[in-house]
Amino acid sequence: MLDLKINGEVRQFPAALTVTGLIDQLGYTGKRIAVERNGEIVPKSQHATTQLAAGDQLEIVVAVGGG
Amino acid sequence: MHQLTIAGKAYRSRLLVGTGKYKDFAETRAAIDASGAEIVTVAIRRTNIGQDASQPNLLDAIPPSQFTILPNTAGCYTADDAVRTLRLARELLDGHPLCKLEVLGDPTNLFPNMPETLKAAETLVKEGFQVMVYCADDPIQCKMLEEIGCVAVMPLASLIGSGMGIVNPWNLRLIIDNAKVPIIVDAGVGTASDATIAMELGCDGVLMNTAIAHAKNPVLMASAMKKGIEAGREAFLAGRMARKYYSADPSSPTSGLIGS
């Protein structure tokens, strides 16, 4: 089991995941999002090669209406 | 010369608009089109994990290929949170460095926390961001932000979302007269005449959201704002006549009157 804290909530995943794998599981493939892992940006170019570890804290953000 | 230039890029429109508080993305887009704005602000927020991921995205309605997207740090109360948010925004927008920094100090009046704003601006400029900064209408701190390297300084006209208009035109004049970067009034405009007054004072542009989004007819107000900005800019460039406080001066000839 892989426990990840995503956008402030702990979620469990059955097996090892890369950032690309996580994005796929969340249904965000092809969406305009950005990912921060443990306080550091994970650039899109590194999504496929960044392996997630238990306890990782992730922020996944999107653009919304605002002034 | 009559264009607004920010960080080396020229814009035809001096009206910058937000995308918050609209009924839906269709209304957002219609209002932006009516406003003629080229620079459009967005906020950065967490995705709703577990909710329908196929929901429409704001950036589909306002594509970065057609607009200059200006991500903001609305809701941030510390320099660290603002910097983190804009690093995410830059990643989201494929490295686009232009951003709107705002670090708030009080949730009831949304006044900026200037020490944190100055701190965040220093970090962001060092990291290569092109920072447009929401700030207090304090001429000294506006100059400090310019000296840090912000590409535009954006003092409030009155409180965010208040629609109270230009409450301190004299401070704005001091800021404008002393500036080497564009000064853009950000926040407080309520109607088209407020935007005109800001431009007549010599502001380089106006950024607004609520005045359009919360008008009864947002699209019509967006059009009015476009005209208000243009009228104010032209009046500023034309140079207004001197005020005469104690004497009238007839517009028609004083000679050749019948019966004289």
Language model feature labels by segment:
Chain A
Residues M1-G66:
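Ubiquitin-like/PB1-type beta-grasp interaction modules and other compact soluble beta-rich domains
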